[in-house]
């Protein structure tokens, strides 16, 4: 018999390489066929609920790394909750209406303006449904466990019907109204935009200082040769000027420059003088802003008057302190104009071109008018200064083109009547990171009314009829009737039925004596779609619960889904749709740049999966601090792959060395474990406690760091490092070996459970090698935290020993550098401890030679020799061990051949082999 045949060498079929791109797909197929999602929920019936509501991604194209970050984060949370005593369903959703779908059809040559509306919308539906299926396949491949057979999609009939009911309830409460006011207008999309659909970019613009001749100074300012000076970055709005706004609290200076006088805010005078180039000027008069109200000026180009009015939005940050006011082209302008009954003059059409309301500009694009106005003001002698100015300007988030403020007649949701209620609900919810609460609170506090109408085709129609005299018709009866039709036929019914067919049978109105009605042509803002999901999904669906426990999305959703959902939910029910909000940063490249095809830094999840596997993306998510922006590159993913290999290989070692361990037969009770094994069991238990607490805070980064640190330092670099001397060498069923196997097996089981939410495919593979009752680790529960009576004392003593171990390892390293020894097992170590350290070592009662991996260890009560290396609480002497290397245990021993029957072995190995392999004594032993 060969020596290796007398060793307990670990064996396992768990492969070193994961072959993840292939094996993951096999596991996912198995999960689907065995309905693991349904099985897990059935196990959790009757347990406390946890409802994470999925914010719907837009169905357009394959998923990107931002999608992966979001969906994997949600999956980790839901998997954890299900394994930790909660009934945690997860229904994935998709946002399917809106401009991107229309843009895709336009690229294919489909013209919405010439095609029948119902047929056009059917093409939109088909495209959107194809995109949903494409993304669903991508999300499944990430290993996301969800109710994939029953997703919610905003184009579903029942969803659209419930959205109509939400609108109807808000209308009934008086929160919906029709009005004309400036809104974000996208000429490139030919539609209004919500705040969440606008992104800001730095652009260059013409900034101009313009002189408006004073015509009436109310007897305070002499109008002769006197001018109000305004500053604007939108010269194209000058034709729509109706007023000049001043702050009543500011002082204004009348400044003599040559034979003319100019009025500017005193606090900006020096800055304005420098900008315009007034080298020689003199303040001849100071006037309070409050005294300037109702003064008048002449428009510098057109034959019209401009009224001086008051507004507290006027600041001393930029400009002149006198603000050009065009109520048809700005929100502040509109609001202040309402107080003075100023005309809402907005002579620009849906394409961004001037109308015949300004005949000479008819058909001109506003950006061309911008240049023309500069020239006209120059020709009129009213242009004091032209300067190119860089500022942050709103753009359409889809088309990337600039937007304008334009007064149009739209439908709005009024926020003011229930703003305080919304703010109160924000206070009651919790936010991760905590700054999210302040951010959302300030957004709601400062936001204006929500423009909910859109001039597009693909969306949920506004369920409004018009009577013969133009009166809007919305009643509880009409709303419910439309909702029921939509439940059966979908919202396309609005375009395939007449108004009469869509109204309740026999419906009449005093506003339509002839019984004639027409339908609203606009659709609802897509944010009203997703913003109603709390009702259409969480409130309405069986098995789900409202309000949701958690909303988790990117930080851009504070002005998007977090915002719109909150408004509709509080408007209808009085409460927030969520108890907690978790926001994440954006995915950037390793240099902090956004992903873009032009930069060539786009990383596709599907490409990563084909090369590395979804587990590597999942590990990347768990390693990242997602509360701020998250970096990704192939290099970063390679680091995640290295971490994965370390985890996998450690598990492989643990599985190999517990393959002959039956937890039901061989487990050693905690009180009977050796001291070092108790120490590791306690360390493992503390790790589980910390990981469960981190999971409860949705802090995957801490979970991963702590687990990886335990695997790398406590297991690989310590416990499993010296384990071979026991696991391989000792008798198979010896107490020391079974004690150590108990801990290693516990670590494998508990770490597999803890890591399942993060690495479900790999942990499922590992679970197949463990001897547990559950067929799948996902059907097991999270490990329970034990309470060990000797916890504190044990950790305290072992912490002291670990400090001593570090010092001894340094002494061994010194001996290695001095060529006294090669590897540590060649050493004979003598430790001279002080009294406290000696007491600690006696208390621990461990095999310290085994733990230090040396051939001989002596704990001496004698005084340390002068050449001993002084440590903090002991002295140490390292020498080369005397004797020969035992070919079985690889230790240097002086008792080789002590047993004549087994002359090549040391006494320890001879005893083990003779007792367990009696045939060896007869047949002899080969190397």
Curated annotation (Swiss-Prot):
L-isoleucyl-5'-AMP binds at residue 553. Zn(2+) binds at residues 886, 889, 906, 909. It comes from the Bacteria. The keyword Acyltransferase does not apply. It catalyses: tRNA(Ile) + L-isoleucine + ATP = L-isoleucyl-tRNA(Ile) + AMP + diphosphate. Its EC number is 6.1.1.5. ATP binds at residue 597. A motif ('KMSKS' region) lies at residues 594-598. Catalyzes the attachment of isoleucine to tRNA(Ile). As IleRS can inadvertently accommodate and process structurally similar amino acids such as valine, to avoid such errors it has two additional distinct tRNA(Ile)-dependent editing activities. One activity is designated as 'pretransfer' editing and involves the hydrolysis of activated Val-AMP. The other activity is designated 'posttransfer' editing and involves deacylation of mischarged Val-tRNA(Ile). This is Isoleucine--tRNA ligase. It comes from Lactobacillus helveticus (strain DPC 4571).
